[in-house]
Amino acid sequence: MSGKTVIVLLSGGLDSMVCAGLAREAGARIVALTIDYNQRHRVELESAARIAAHVGAAEHIVLPLDLRRFGGSALTADIDVPKDGVGTDIPVTYVPARNLIFLSLTLGLAEARQAADIVIGVNALDYSGYPDCRPAFIQGFEKLAALATRDGDQGVRFHIHAPLQHMTKADIAAEAARLGMDAAMSWSCYDPTPEGLHCGACDSCRLRRKGFADAGLADPTRYA
């Protein structure tokens, strides 16, 4: 990736922060894309801005897309965020087709910037079971990108890099430390308190806390 323009889908979470750090380490010219989808945890947008500045992104685009108009998720509708542990079923925090929507927008930006590399922080090990985080989805989207774009029609091969896909949350926390990324810049909680703290009980908080504990690292997160 050295010297290449790379589009990093930057939510502001720990995973996307590590992806941005990896792109910086590779010497890429980073264009960060953050989607403001009117999510419950909009505080992550502030984290995304801090991370983009920290990695020296050439551009940081914040794109508004009001998915509350769709609803259907605890992150985009008046549905309680579950706090009873990480289960085996797909939870109500799943946002319908979110990564498909976000990657489609990222692909459009990549083609507009004449970039063929996209980085996304999906994870298929320590995660909430979302179907759009699985390897088959990423592989399928690469094929779609070749069929759906002018550049693809002209032989450009888009690469969807998911460097964290087979890492545990402990691996990801350790990678953040190796990269010199301050994890306190990132935001994971789905249901922040009015005081601006991580709730400590939603799936995302539980996975984050467990990751730091399993890695034997101090967790800089402020929990309620």
Swiss-Prot record:
The keyword Metal-binding applies. Keywords: ATP-binding, Ligase, Metal-binding, Nucleotide-binding, Queuosine biosynthesis, Zinc. Its cofactor is Zn(2+). Binds 1 zinc ion per subunit. GO terms for molecular function: ATP binding; ligase activity, forming carbon-nitrogen bonds; zinc ion binding. Its EC number is 6.3.4.20. The lineage of its organism: Bacteria, Pseudomonadati, Pseudomonadota, Alphaproteobacteria, Sphingomonadales. It catalyses: 7-carboxy-7-deazaguanine + NH4(+) + ATP = 7-cyano-7-deazaguanine + ADP + phosphate + H2O + H(+). Belongs to the QueC family. ATP binds at L10, S11, G12, G13, L14, D15, S16, M17, V18, C19, A20. Pfam families: QueC (PF06508). Catalyzes the ATP-dependent conversion of 7-carboxy-7-deazaguanine (CDG) to 7-cyano-7-deazaguanine (preQ(0)). It comes from Sphingopyxis alaskensis (strain DSM 13593 / LMG 18877 / RB2256) (Sphingomonas alaskensis). The gene is queC1. This is 7-cyano-7-deazaguanine synthase 1. The keyword Zinc applies. GO terms for biological process: queuosine biosynthetic process. Zn(2+) binds at C189, C199, C202, C205. Pathway: Purine metabolism; 7-cyano-7-deazaguanine biosynthesis.
